[in-house]
From Swiss-Prot:
CDD domains: Ribosomal_uL14
Molecular function via GO: large ribosomal subunit rRNA binding; structural constituent of ribosome
Protein species of origin: Mycoplasma genitalium (strain ATCC 33530 / DSM 19775 / NCTC 10195 / G37) (Mycoplasmoides genitalium)
The family this protein is said to belong to: Belongs to the universal ribosomal protein uL14 family.
Function: Binds to 23S rRNA. Forms part of two intersubunit bridges in the 70S ribosome.
Species classification: Bacteria, Bacillati, Mycoplasmatota, Mycoplasmoidales, Mycoplasmoidaceae
Short name of any one Pfam family annotated for the protein: Ribosomal_L14
Name of the featured protein: Large ribosomal subunit protein uL14
Keyword Secreted: no
Nuclease keyword on record: no
InterPro entries: Ribosomal_uL14 (IPR000218), Ribosomal_uL14_bac-type (IPR005745), Ribosomal_uL14_CS (IPR019972), Ribosomal_uL14_sf (IPR036853)
């Protein structure tokens, strides 16, 4: 569960290291984003010769959250950091690699390309 102004680590190789949430997409007054939700982010920290630059406004999908989430089978899922993957307008990832584990809930939201690039699906 992340909200406005939350800093997220970027789990792909686009060149961005950290982003900040500007808006949670999906409803008019939606306050919190969960696994698989799309957010509008601003790049806060980036490497010098990456695909994205500091200050750019992009879309991202949440792949890891520190806040635990309960699944239908009763298990809880919790990660060590809040992380996202930068995406294009057509929901495809901007990068070509995904670092770290990602949640299985992304499959239900239609992010199969992100799951195929991920090292580990939890």
């Amino acid at each position: 569960m992340v909200s406005f102004m939350t800093r997220l680590n970027v789990a792909d190789n686009t060149g961005a290291k950290q982003v900040g949430i500007i808006k949670v997409l999906g409803a008019t007054y939606k306050r919190y984003a969960f696994l698989g939700d799309v957010v509008v982010v601003s790049v806060k920290d980036a490497i010098p010769n990456g695909m994205v630059k500091k200050g750019q406004v992009l879309r991202a999908v949440i792949v890891r959250t520190k806040k635990g989430q309960q699944r239908q089978d009763g298990t809880h899922l919790k990660f060590h950091d809040n992380a996202c993957v930068l995406i294009k307008e057509d929901k495809s990832p901007r990068g070509t690699r995904i670092f770290g584990p990602v949640a299985r809930e992304l499959r239900e939201k239609g992010y199969n390309k992100i799951l195929s690039l991920a090292v580990e699906v939890v």
